[in-house]
Each structure stands twice: as structure tokens, then as C-alpha cells.
Amino acid sequence: VTVYENEGTKVDFDGNLRLLL
């Protein structure tokens, strides 16, 4: 499971793009 974080965004292991609050 890899999580990628960049400039207030986050992509979870399902590939969903989310905003970090």
C-alpha cells in the first residue's frame, strides 16, 4: 500500500485523490 502526498493532496491505495484537511 503506497500513499502519495503532495501540496495538500493525497492519493490512497485505491487511487482516490483527496484533499488533506
Curated annotation (Swiss-Prot):
The keyword Transmembrane applies. One of its GO terms (biological process) is monoatomic ion transport. The keyword Transmembrane applies. Keywords: Cell outer membrane, Disulfide bond, Ion transport, Membrane, Porin, Transmembrane, Transmembrane beta strand, Transport. It is found in: Cell outer membrane. It comes from the Bacteria. Its main location: membrane. GO terms for molecular function: porin activity. GO terms for cellular component: cell outer membrane; pore complex. Structural rigidity of the outer membrane of elementary bodies and porin forming, permitting diffusion of solutes through the intracellular reticulate body membrane. Binds carcinoembryonic antigen (CEA). This is Outer membrane protein P2. It comes from Glaesserella parasuis.
